[in-house]
Amino acid sequence: MARVLRDGAFSGETHIVTGAVQGIGRAVATTLAEHGAQLLLVDLDAGRLAETAAEIGRVAQVKPIFAAANVAEEAHVQRAVAHALDATGVVNGVVNVAGITRDARIPKKSFDDFKLVVGVHLYGTFLFLREVAAQCWHAQFKNAGNQPLDDGVNRFVVNFSSVSARNGNVGQIDYTAAKGAIEAATRTAAREFSAYRARVNAIAPGPVNTPMLAAVGEEGMRAMGRATLVGRVAEPQDIASFVCALADPRISGYVTGQVFPVNGGIYLA
């Protein structure tokens, strides 16, 4: 889908991407930048963020800024969004990719791990939804006399669920619960953010060739690929291209409150 985007589709816009140093997040950030977006990259590791920003700067005509932050920490997210706003003057969109797993079956699942996983996925998604709205879009709404923002400005959110939210996954009660909650939160945010004319959608990928999936090994990856209808696991770019389509109002300007199963047919909704 990235191929159908206009050149410079996101020029003059600032997008926030969490989980930006590897896998899906890095592919999303790179593809958005290639189509003109200024970026705030968010992840835990400042060194890897600097490397990622430099690499994106070499392949795109933008120089991303970044913020080392724990997405589950309120103050970190507040500072990250403020940094984007101070540096660029605008935030048009946020892509909530950041995620972790701590697999264990329910009898062995520690409460600390449960809270950690839910925190990164669900709390992180909520905090970026809240802060982008509070610091950026709600002020514009108030300045417009509390009237819908029919100003032609592109505003969007793309959240990340998972096929596991619908199908379950052994050892991942924390991950699957958080992803299911993100789907519900996406629908609520779509209703609330309609006043800002911001589109809020989510993607529910199947297996993707990322470091998070590497633990299954090559044979496990091939087996997952065989379980899909397209015969392979996704590459990060498959997901990034769909994100960019959701970010572009000329492609998805009439789409909000939806969860898209970008999963190769491994699960049919």
Name the predicted role of every residue range.
Residues 235-262, 267:
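C-terminal substrate-recognition "lid" of short-chain dehydrogenase/reductases
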Residues 46-47, 68-80, 111, 238:
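The beta1-alpha1 cofactor-binding region of Rossmann-like NAD(H)/NADP(H)-dependent oxidoreductases
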Residues 162:
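Residue(s) in the substrate-gating loop at a strand-loop-helix junction
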Residues 129, 178, 186:
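Active-site helix of classical SDR
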Residues 14, 21-22:
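Conserved glycine-rich cofactor-binding loop
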